[in-house]
Amino acid sequence: MSFLPITKEEMTARGWEAADFVYVTGDAYVDHPSFGPAIITRLLESQGYQVAVLAQPRFDTPEDVTRFGRPRLGFLVSGGNIDSMVAHYTAARRLRSEDFYSPGCRAGLRPDRATIVYCRLIREAYGDIPIVIGGLEASLRRFAHYDYWDDAVRPSILADSGADLLIYGMGEHQMTEIAARMAGGEPPAAMRDIRGTCYLCPLSDPLPENAVSCASFDKVSQDKKTYARACRLQLEEQDHVTGRAVVQKHGERYLVQNPPALPLTTEELDAVAELPYERYYHPIYEEMGGVPAIKEVEFSLTHNRGCFGACNFCSIAFHQGRYITTRSHASLLREAERFTHNPHFKGYIHDVGGPTANFRAPSCAKQATHGLCRDKKCLAPTRCPAVRVDHTDYVQLLRELRAIPGVKKVFVRSGLRYDYMMGEEDDTFLTELVRYHISGQLKVAPEHCSARVLDEMGKPHINVYEAFLRRFQRICQKEGKELYLIPYLMSSHPGSTMRDAVELALFLKKHHLRPQQVQDFYPTPGTASTCMFYTGIDPWTMQSVFVPTDPYEKKLQRTLLQYWKPENRRLVIEALVRAGREDLIGHGPDCLVQPDREYLISRRAPGQGGPDPKLTAKPHPGARRPKSTHRKKR
């Protein structure tokens, strides 16, 4: 095994005059199956193509894109493992100081909107050479979409980038067919019948049979109700059984999304996972400090794809789909056994998971032939009676992994759906999880405690979490284990008022939880929650939703989740006053915060000093964030 060439010298050493494909990525080159670029490049290599990797090229000049010369078939472009704007900016739009997908965690090695920038550099260097885009950034931006950083609706990234074809979702099937047809002389711009792809065509061209139309780019840019309806239609057509082609007009062209690609079978998923990856970053990065993103996944196992949880704020369903596909035990055992021959392996498998760790089968029997339901979720607000809850196969897999010579411990660190676990009366899985697979803490994701907010999130109500907490504590006590359940929580999600944030603070106090880090809702492309953030409308119900968009209000909601910190007292008091919960300011056991001098002065009797207008002013109920000075007008 060896890394694919990332320099002209490495390509020449292989005896190649030119590459068939040059794969351009916004990440450093890490040859590991947790990284999308590694999967696609190794897949193409296994099919006989010569593939060079252009990782994090300079973006101020087209010089780097000519590093390998003109590829024989074309360029493949990805922004990297995550959206380049998410890689660069926090939820508060502040520039990040670190990039875990770059050598030495160094920020700034990829451009904003990397896919678009790379495509334009390629066009500048090579004119009309074929370009196919894919990866998460392209996949989630395939339709006209609200862009949080521009605070405006942008067109499909296919139109913006000037590429010939877009692959959405997990791209193995699509890439295999595209490469074969390109090798046969067909340009990708002419490929209009491949599932899991998007293309652009003139308005006069025929459209796919049974295609459905959503509102045009111009219309969704101008009217928020229209945007919300288009969002729902797009989300409803992402099932590989029932999904239809979706058409969206962009100026004088149609954007056409073909139906989703078929999921990989177990045999295909095994084959992809067992391609000859180096499972590490390229040695060129060693002197720069390596690539930090490898640390958590180097000795982890991914056993499934897809997620039928389908939370509204999560992009997994829009990218991987809701249908569960899994790898075989034999394949996973072979991968784990190979760990034991790695000199860096200390005997600990860090995780056995995927989008959701404890999903080993589709949620119900009908999905293979009828697809997943369009109008309801499997687990929220309550679990569908048709959902099959069975951890038998996962328990057996974990037992087999524990038995491998050289493996000391197998951890399951995250991605467990506790609501799914609560559908099974048998305690075997949770008991073995507690006994063997948790290192001190188990992290799960209730996200909030307010029923209204959880409904907008597409999550089960908090009583399910509290029932799981009691069950977890009972089993820990029985097993003699001192373990802790750590909840992931989110502030400022659409639907969350200041009173909801106070309710969440009281939930933390009740359960003696003090989170050191707080996650603010991040409006990323391709999710129903981002649609709510932009439009103030729930696309599933078309009902209005309160949206906390004012930066200061979001700060107050976030601060309430750390109400106990002395430095937060002034903000917590202000939040409680705004919420009409001054009963929680005081010295009693049920209070969240003690009054400070400013608060006491503001509450003096008339004639002894007036109230502080900052504390008594009522917020505008529909207040939205002020327009950003850096917003780009389209």
Indicate residue ranges for each PLM-predicted region.
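Terminal amphipathic helices with adjacent charged low-complexity linkers/tails
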Residues: 60, 189-239, 252, 261-264, ...
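Acidic, low-complexity intrinsically disordered tails
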Residues: 376, 595-634
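Flexible glycine/acidic-rich beta-alpha junction loops that bind and position SAM and/or redox cofactors
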Residues: 83-92, 140-142, 172-177, 201-206, ...
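Conserved SAM/AdoMet-binding glycine-rich loop
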Residues: 23, 58-59, 337-486, 490-494
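Glycine-rich beta-alpha loop elements in corrinoid/cobalamin-binding modules
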Residues: 10, 36, 55-250, 257
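N-terminal [4Fe-4S]-dependent radical SAM core
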Residues: 1-18, 28, 225-300
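N-terminal pre-triad scaffold of radical SAM enzymes
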Residues: 24-29, 288-315, 340, 348
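Conserved, mostly hydrophobic/aromatic
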Residues: 164, 272, 307, 311, ...
